[in-house]
Amino acid sequence: MSQRGNRKTQVGVVVSDKMDKTVVVRVSHLVKHPVYNKYIKRSVKYKAHDTDNSCKTGDRVLIVETRPLSKDKRWKVRQIIDRVE
């Protein structure tokens, strides 16, 4: 069995599930300001492929990098970590 190499993974929160088989995931991280040495919260939104339409808004998900699936989609949902009820 061949392995394709290490793919990037991110953990984020689903902020939109209105598209078919696509969710928008917000991934947050901390960045240190170079002058003031204060940590600032930054976030990036990724469109991720959700094959089964199983993700709902507010779910914490693990996304993995993949080949380009459309103009904006380069991530797939691997698993749902926490579900919102």
From Swiss-Prot:
Entry GO terms, CC: cytosolic small ribosomal subunit
Biological processes, Gene Ontology terms: translation
Keyword list, A-Z: Ribonucleoprotein, Ribosomal protein, RNA-binding, rRNA-binding
InterPro entries, per the entry: NA-bd_OB-fold (IPR012340), Ribosomal_uS17 (IPR000266), Ribosomal_uS17_bact/chlr (IPR019984), Ribosomal_uS17_CS (IPR019979)
Keyword RNA-binding among UniProt keywords: yes
An annotated Gene Ontology molecular function: structural constituent of ribosome
Function of the molecule: One of the primary rRNA binding proteins, it binds specifically to the 5'-end of 16S ribosomal RNA.
Family of this protein: Belongs to the universal ribosomal protein uS17 family.
Subunit structure: Part of the 30S ribosomal subunit.
Protein name, per record: Small ribosomal subunit protein uS17
Organism, as annotated: Geobacter sulfurreducens (strain ATCC 51573 / DSM 12127 / PCA)
